[in-house]
């Protein structure tokens, strides 16, 4: 059975190892984080610290956008967009990785401390009862400070998190 993780779409472009896990995983991705990919790809702001890494990641973002725009995948994603909190049918990537897109709705529940995308990630983790996978240490700190009742995993601990069942 696949282990589920909540995450932003851009994490797949930045952290290639997420597409090559040793056991099955399902990445539940809020739809608005897919929309962010367009801004990141075409924006002049650096995503990565060096121009070479930035160009590589922006190329990977372009590949992700093309994947999500593929007519077969686009139809599946559009099914999720028909109603709040609906999930798309699974989008298989390879033998071990499946994407599921969720039409998360930010309700300002955590709006004073967290931005809308962060709030969607939090609410999705709560609704899906799945851990949130992130590489943003400041977001991790805010989650801890606000005592948000979700499991959070730093991307550096991803391999450990996929090694069987455990409780944090």
Label the predicted regions.
Residues 132-133:
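Conserved SAM-binding loop
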Residues 2-128, 137-146, 151, 156-162:
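Active-site-proximal, substrate-binding regions of enzyme catalytic domains
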Residues 166-168:
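Short acidic DE-rich linear segments
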């Amino acid at each position: 059975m696949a282990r589920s993780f909540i995450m932003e779409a851009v994490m797949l472009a930045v952290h290639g190892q997420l597409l090559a896990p040793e056991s099955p995983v399902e990445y539940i991705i809020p739809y608005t984080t897919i929309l962010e990919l367009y801004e990141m790809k075409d924006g002049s702001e650096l995503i990565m610290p060096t121009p070479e890494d930035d160009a590589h990641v922006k190329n990977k973002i372009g590949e992700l956008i093309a994947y999500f725009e593929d007519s077969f995948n686009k139809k599946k994603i559009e099914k999720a967009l028909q109603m709040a909190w609906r999930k798309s049918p699974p989008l298989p990537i390879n033998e071990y990785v499946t994407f599921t897109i969720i039409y998360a709705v930010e309700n300002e529940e955590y709006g004073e401390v967290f931005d809308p995308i962060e709030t969607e990630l939090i609410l999705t983790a709560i609704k899906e009862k799945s851990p949130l996978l992130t590489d943003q240490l400041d977001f991790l700190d805010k989650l801890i400070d606000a005592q948000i009742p979700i499991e959070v995993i730093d991307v550096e601990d991803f391999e450990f998190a996929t090694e069987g069942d455990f409780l944090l």
